[in-house]
From Swiss-Prot:
A cellular component term, taken from the record's GO annotations: cyclin-dependent protein kinase holoenzyme complex
Job of this protein: Cyclin partner of the cyclin-dependent kinase (CDK) PHO85. Has a role in cell integrity and polarized cell growth together with the other PCL1/PCL2 cyclin family members.
Similarity section: Belongs to the cyclin family. PCL1,2 subfamily.
Keyword list, A-Z: Cyclin
GO biological process: positive regulation of macroautophagy; regulation of cell cycle
Entry-linked InterPro entries: Cyclin_PHO80-like
Subunit structure: Forms a cyclin-CDK complex with PHO85.
Name of the protein: PHO85 cyclin CLG1
Any one Gene Ontology molecular-function term assigned to this protein's record: protein kinase binding
Length: 452
C-alpha cells in the first residue's frame, strides 16, 4: 500500500475552495469505503503549484492507518522537442551555411598517449624481418658474381638470364637472408670452383641450370653456418624448386670438397660490402646518353665510298684515339680513359684467397664490369689489347689498294700546325709534321683526334 496522499480528496475543502487533505477518521473499513464512494464536490480548476497547505506527517498514521487513496506525483515538465540536426548535402562548405541546426561532421579525437596502429608489411617467416638491402639490386649483384665465377657470358636481355634473376629474387623473398650470409655464399661459390680439379668442367660446365643449383647450395651452406635461424633441406627444396635428393647430393659433394671446413679467417667481408655499395650506386645512377660518334676525316678530294671498320674495344671507350697519335686527357678520365687489365697481377681483394678477383679480372671474363671505368681507369694499355678506334680490315685494305692504284692520286691536305709541346704521358705527342707511316693507314688518309 503506497504511503502517499492525493492532492484532491473526494470529500473536503476549505472556505477558500482549496483542497484540504486530512486523514480519514478511525473506524471500520466499511465507513471508509462509504466515504470513499461519496461524490466529490466540484471545486473548479486549481493549479498544482498553488497548494500552500503543509501536508501532515505520515509518522503518526502507522501501517494500517494509511488512507486508501493513492498519491499521484505531478507530471514532469515537458521538454522542448528539438529537431535533429540536418546535415548539409555533399559539396557545401560548413562555414558558408548560417543554419544553426547544421553541425560539422564529427572529428575523431585521439586521446593523449593513444597512437594510431601503424600498418606494417607482414613478413611470413625468413631469417631477417628487416633487410639491409634491396632485393632487386642484391639479386643482380648475386647473378653477376655467379656469372664471373663460372666464366659465363650471358646477356642481361636474355630470357634465360631473366628467369635466373627471378629465381634468385624469389629465394631471397622467401628466406630473407641477411647480407652477411649472401656475401659468405658468394665467397663459398668462388672457393668451391677453385677447389675443383678441372674447374667448372668437373661439374658439367657453366649452363644456367648448373649455375643456379650451385648458387642455391652456397646459400644453404652459408645459412647453416652463419645464421641462428636455419631451414631444413625440405624447406629449401620448396623455396628453390630443386628436388630434395638433388640438394642432399650437392650438399655432400660440397662438404667433401671443403673437407667439412666452412670457416675461413680470410673471408673479406668489408671488401664485399664496399663492392656492393659501388654496384648499388651504379645501379641507381640514371642512364647517360652515349655521345654521337664523329665521322673520321678522310681525303676530301677522293669521293670514293670508303668502308671503315669501327671497332671500339670497350663499350665505354667510344672515343679512344689512334695509336701513336694520342690525345692528352683534356676530358674527365671516367668518360674517355681506357681500362687496363693486367693478367699477371691481382689486387688486394684476392691476395689472401688467391683464386679470384672481383674487379681486376682478365679481359675475357669482364664483359660486365667494363661499364665501371671510373673504378679502374688507367692509361692506355701497351700489352696484348688493341685500343685503336679507327681500324681497317685486311680485306678492305687490299680492295682499297687495288682501287687506289687505278685512280690518280688525290691532293694531299696540309697537316695542321701542332706545337712541339710534351705532355706528362708515357706515350707523349708525335708531331703531325712528320711523315705519316702507319701500317693501318694509307698516305692520303689523315687520322685526327676524336676529342675536340
Amino acid at each position: 500500500m503506497a504511503n502517499t496522499f492525493k492532492y484532491y480528496p473526494e470529500t473536503m475543502g476549505n472556505s477558500s475552495g482549496y483542497p484540504i487533505s486530512l486523514p480519514f477518521p478511525k473506524g471500520s473499513a466499511t465507513s471508509a469505503v462509504n466515504v470513499a464512494r461519496q461524490l466529490p464536490k466540484y471545486l473548479g480548476h486549481v493549479p498544482s503549484q498553488s497548494v500552500h497547505t503543509q501536508l501532515p506527517s505520515m509518522a503518526s498514521l502507522g501501517y494500517f492507518n494509511q488512507p486508501s487513496s493513492t498519491y499521484y506525483a505531478p507530471p514532469a515538465p515537458l521538454q522542448q522537442h528539438q529537431q535533429p540536426p540536418i546535415l548539409p548535402p555533399p559539396g557545401l562548405m560548413y562555414t558558408s551555411n548560417n543554419n544553426s541546426n547544421v553541425i560539422p561532421p564529427p572529428v575523431q579525437m585521439i586521446r593523449d598517449g593513444q597512437q594510431q596502429p601503424q600498418q606494417s608489411n607482414q613478413v611470413n617467416g625468413g631469417v631477417s624481418e628487416n633487410l639491409d638491402y634491396d632485393i632487386s639490386i642484391m639479386s643482380k649483384f648475386i647473378m653477376e658474381n655467379a656469372f664471373v665465377a663460372f666464366n659465363a657470358n650471358y646477356s642481361t636481355d636474355d630470357q634465360t638470364t631473366d628467369l635466373f634473376f627471378k629465381g634468385i629474387s624469389s629465394v631471397l623473398n622467401a628466406t630473407r637472408l641477411p647480407s652477411a650470409t649472401i656475401f659468405l655464399a658468394i665467397d663459398y661459390l668462388f672457393k668451391y670452383i677453385n677447389k675443383l680439379s678441372n674447374g667448372i668442367h668437373s661439374i658439367g660446365g657453366n649452363s644456367i641450370n648448373i649455375i643456379y643449383q650451385n648458387t642455391m647450395i652456397a646459400f644453404i651452406l652459408a645459412n647453416k653456418f652463419n645464421d641462428d635461424k636455419t631451414f631444413t633441406n625440405n624447406s629449401w627444396s620448396q623455396a628453390t624448386g630443386i628436388l630434395i635428393n638433388v640438394i642432399n647430393d650437392f650438399e655432400r659433394q660440397w662438404l667433401r670438397i671443403f673437407n667439412w671446413e666452412l670457416y675461413d679467417s680470410a673471408f673479406l667481408y668489408f671488401e664485399f660490402v664496399k663492392n656492393f655499395e659501388i654496384f648499388k650506386q651504379n645501379q641507381l645512377k640514371p642512364a647517360v646518353a652515349v655521345p654521337t660518334l664523329l665521322s673520321p676525316i678522310v681525303n676530301v678530294g677522293d669521293t670514293r665510298n670508303v668502308n671503315f671498320n669501327l671497332k671500339p674495344t670497350s663499350t665505354n671507350n667510344l672515343l679512344s684515339p689512334v695509336s701513336n697519335y694520342e690525345t692528352p686527357m683534356l676530358m674527365p678520365h671516367n668518360m674517355f680513359s681506357s681500362p687496363s687489365y693486367q693478367s699477371n697481377s691481382r689486387s688486394e681483394f684476392s691476395s689472401m684467397n688467391g683464386y679470384y678477383n672481383y674487379y681486376n679480372y682478365n679481359q675475357p671474363r669482364l664483359n660486365y664490369y667494363q661499364q665501371f671505368p671510373n673504378i679502374y681507369s688507367s692509361p692506355i694499355s701497351e700489352t696484348q689489347f688493341d685500343y685503336d678506334f679507327y681500324n681497317f680490315s685486311s680485306q678492305q685494305q687490299q680492295q682499297q689498294q687495288k682501287q687506289h692504284s687505278l685512280l690518280p692520286a688525290a691532293p694531299q691536305l696540309p697537316p695542321p700546325h701542332v706545337h712541339n709541346q710534351s705532355y706528362g704521358h708515357h706515350l707523349g705527342w708525335k708531331s703531325m709534321d712528320d711523315t705519316i707511316n702507319h701500317s693501318r693507314f694509307e698516305r692520303n688518309y689523315f687520322p685526327y683526334s676524336a676529342v675536340y
